């Protein structure tokens, strides 16, 4: 039985006051939040400490949107997993399309980060997805295949229990244009097939890993999406920054 995971990515949004106030409101709403799901919030790095403190001891996991794969060292502007641990942060998002597109993050750098994090007992939410141009030129599966094969290269079978995947078609992010359930299902199925092909015995892992869909997810479309066989949750951007949507989404 795969776990249903709903993750909220606040990206580089909200002032400190807004982020902390949203965290307090989420805490109050926890009784209304669906049971039996894993809920995660990813505030900006600057707000991690404050949000993690507010949600400490609750069922909501607080995660980081990025990390540098090193212990404490001279990497100006970066954050070490060691520093995240101190805050009680156990989940890190890797490979979000905004980092790939605007910050030049490659599959191989994602792979380095994933190795480092899994070795240090973090849960990793690894994001993949094609751009509109890639989809329109018939490259969707080729792109996803490289992101899976290169991003997850050399990951040991026993570490997969700490991995969650997210499929986010870039053309559906923040555009209001949601992938149809059939479009999302087709790619989620493909992702599972790619994972099954990673190494001998990976078929079982592919069946048990949670794959979230991201791209304009809202309370009014999440249920339809979750009806698809290979969709196990949502990675929510815009809607996760509004408290009103929490009871319907998380
Ligand atoms: O990480 C979240 C995604 O990029 C989706 O963002 O829900 O605003 O489309 P969105």
UniProtKB/Swiss-Prot annotation:
EC number(s) given by UniProt: 5.3.1.1
UniProt xrefs under CDD domains: TIM
Recorded metabolic or biological pathway in which this protein acts: Carbohydrate biosynthesis; gluconeogenesis; Carbohydrate degradation; glycolysis; D-glyceraldehyde 3-phosphate from glycerone phosphate: step 1/1
Cellular component per GO, a single term: cytosol
One Pfam match: TIM
Sample GO molecular function, one term: triose-phosphate isomerase activity
PROSITE patterns assigned to the protein according to its UniProt record, in alphabetical order: TIM_1, TIM_2
Record's catalysed reaction(s): D-glyceraldehyde 3-phosphate = dihydroxyacetone phosphate
Active-site residues, record numbering mapped to chain: 96, 168
Main location, first listed in the record: cytoplasm
Keyword Cytoplasm: yes
Record bears the keyword Cytoplasm: yes
Gene3D superfamilies linked to this entry: Aldolase class I (3.20.20.70)
Listed GO biological process terms: gluconeogenesis; glyceraldehyde-3-phosphate biosynthetic process; glycerol catabolic process; glycolytic process
Protein location: Cytoplasm
Key words of the record: Cytoplasm, Gluconeogenesis, Glycolysis, Isomerase
Top-rank EC class of the record's enzyme: isomerase
InterPro entries assigned to the protein according to its UniProt record, in alphabetical order: Aldolase_TIM, TIM_sf, TrioseP_Isoase_bac/euk, Triosephosphate_isomerase, Triosephosphate_isomerase_AS
Binding site for substrate: 9-11, 174, 216, 237-238
Its job: Involved in the gluconeogenesis. Catalyzes stereospecifically the conversion of dihydroxyacetone phosphate (DHAP) to D-glyceraldehyde-3-phosphate (G3P).
Family, similarity comment: Belongs to the triosephosphate isomerase family.
Record text on subunit structure and interactions: Homodimer.
Protein name, as recorded: Triosephosphate isomerase
Phylogenetic placement of the source organism: Bacteria, Pseudomonadati, Spirochaetota, Spirochaetia, Leptospirales
